[in-house]
Amino acid sequence: MRYIVVDLEATCWEDVRDYDRMEIIEIGAVELPAADSFPTREFSRFVRPTIEPELSPFCQQLTTIRQRDVDRASEFPAVFAEFVEWTGDEPFVLCSWGGYDLTQFRIDCDRHGLSLPKSFERHVNLKKEFARLAGLRKSCGMKGALSHLGLPLEGTHHRGIDDARNIARIAAVILPRLSPLSD
């Protein structure tokens, strides 16, 4: 079974979490050909937001994504089509750190009149599974999980592709311990 580890970055504002306004601005993903394998392929694209095309200063500082990065990017429908094509026809399990990424995919698909592919329905919330397997009372962030495992953060936190790579490192510990996920 293949695993696609995805991390999204979205428009954001200081002290405001408004899901109706948030739009995906980066899709980062890595493919794990098996639960205990290393990433073999990567997908990294910026997305041009349409509701509020100007990134807030807070968003730019948090993500290090610059205005020119999203200005040069395609809008969500085109980038999402590329991502779906990249995932391929073979079955896979979509993995993310928490439920946010899958929710944001649904929101952006609905906003643009797109259907979320059925293949995205097989999803593992790695944040929840990590807390369960580590015996934690409360889930922790990605950086906390890396620290718990004795792994350093690599790359830039809150960048889709870098976070996807880091989450894949955590996934390599978690996925082999989960019940087998069949086709």
Label the model's feature ranges.
Residues 1-8:
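N-terminal accessory regions of nucleic-acid-interacting proteins
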Residues 2, 20-27, 31-63, 84-183:
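Metal-dependent phosphoesterase core characteristic of DEDDh/y 3'-5' exonuclease domains
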Residues 8-17:
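Short acidic, Gly/Ser-rich segments with clustered Asp/Glu that frequently serve as metal-coordination loops
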Residues 61-80:
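Metal-dependent phosphoesterase signature
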